[in-house]
C-alpha cells in the first residue's frame, strides 16, 4: 500500500530502510497515471516502503529536496537520497531502480 506523507512526518518516514517518495500534485496528469504503478510496486516489492507527498499541501520537503518538476520520485536509503527520476516511468524501470539499491 502506498502511504500518504505530510511535511510533519516526512523525515521520520524516510529515516530507515529503502523508501520511494512520489512528489506529486492532484492536478498533474502524469502523477495520476503513476499511482497504479506505485500501488503495484508496493504490493510486489515488500522490501521498499512507498509514499506520496502532495507538494501543493506540503511544500517544505519539495523545497528541501529542490523538486522543480512533477512527478519526481526520490529513492532514499536510511534517510539519504540514492536516486532521483523525474517524469512518468514504467513499472519495469522503477523495479530495476529500486532493486539496484536494495
UniProtKB/Swiss-Prot annotation:
One GO cellular component this record assigns the protein to is: cytosol
Concerning SUPFAM superfamilies, the annotation shows:
Thioredoxin-like
Give the classification, highest ranks.
Bacteria, Pseudomonadati, Chlamydiota, Chlamydiia, Chlamydiales
Q: Which terms does the UniProt entry file under GO BP?
A: cell redox homeostasis
- What is the protein name stated in its UniProt record? Thioredoxin
Recorded hits in InterPro entries, A to Z, give: Thioredoxin, Thioredoxin-like_sf, Thioredoxin_CS, Thioredoxin_domain
| Family named by the database record | Belongs to the thioredoxin family.
The disulfide bridges present are: 28-31
- Thioredoxin domain sequence ranges: 1-102
Q: What are the UniProt keywords, alphabetically?
A: Disulfide bond, Electron transport, Redox-active center, Transport
Q: Which PROSITE patterns match?
A: THIOREDOXIN_1 (PS00194), THIOREDOXIN_2 (PS51352)
Q: Which residues cross the membrane?
A: none
The job of this chain, per UniProt, is described as: Participates in various redox reactions through the reversible oxidation of its active center dithiol to a disulfide and catalyzes dithiol-disulfide exchange reactions.
**Keyword Cell membrane (UniProt):** no
Gene responsible for this protein = trxA
Amino acid at each position: 500500500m502506498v502511504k500518504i506523507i505530510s511535511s510533519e512526518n516526512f523525515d521520520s518516514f524516510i529515516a530507515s530502510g529503502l523508501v520511494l517518495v512520489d512528489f506529486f500534485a492532484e492536478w498533474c496528469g502524469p502523477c495520476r497515471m503513476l499511482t497504479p504503478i506505485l500501488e503495484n510496486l508496493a504490493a510486489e516489492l515488500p522490501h521498499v516502503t512507498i509514499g506520496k507527498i502532495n507538494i501543493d499541501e506540503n511544500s517544505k520537503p519539495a523545497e528541501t529536496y529542490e523538486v522543480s518538476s512533477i512527478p519526481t520520485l526520490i529513492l532514499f536509503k536510511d534517510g539519504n537520497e540514492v536516486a532521483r527520476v523525474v517524469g512518468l516511468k514504467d513499472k519495469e524501470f522503477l523495479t530495476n531502480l529500486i532493486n539496484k539499491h536494495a
